[in-house]
Amino acid sequence: YPRILKDHFAIDFICDTLRMMTMNLEDPHQVEDAMEKQLEKHHHEAADPAHAMQTMADGLPALGIVAAVLGVIKTMGAIESPPSVLGGYIGGALVGTFLGVFIAYGFVGPFAAYMQAVYDEEHSFYKIIQDVLVAHLHGNAAQISVEIGRGGVPTKMQPSFTELETALDSIPAEVG
């Protein structure tokens, strides 16, 4: 399972949970609570860069307004200049406003939203791991536990029951 092997948090998450299970902490609710706390902490920490980008996106229009105000001040300082000079100052003020709004809503905001979507998708992946392990702790058979995990897969990626069954049947007996 290459995705799990490349994901250090997923490996630690699975190993820590299995370690708790081997230490006779077999109450599924306690294990689920511990896993939930670990997932919340990880999700909160992983989302910090997206929150920082969104904060920057929220502030950029204000910088555009500051540029507009400075442009107006500069224009007022040269009020006796010919219209062509005043037009340049006013144009500069408008460009500053436009850039602040354009960069915020055209680049930084969408990038922050994309980052958050990636973190949310990762969180779904970890949540599926949690669902499968907790279902197993409740005494369900492996196929039932995996089916419970399948229910948490986002719809656009969720395999059908038949696809999952085919994948499970393809696992060699010595592994399963």
Predicted regions and their residues:
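Large intracellular
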Residues: Y1-P49, E121-G176
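Helix-termination/interfacial motifs at the ends of transmembrane alpha-helices
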Residues: Q38-V118
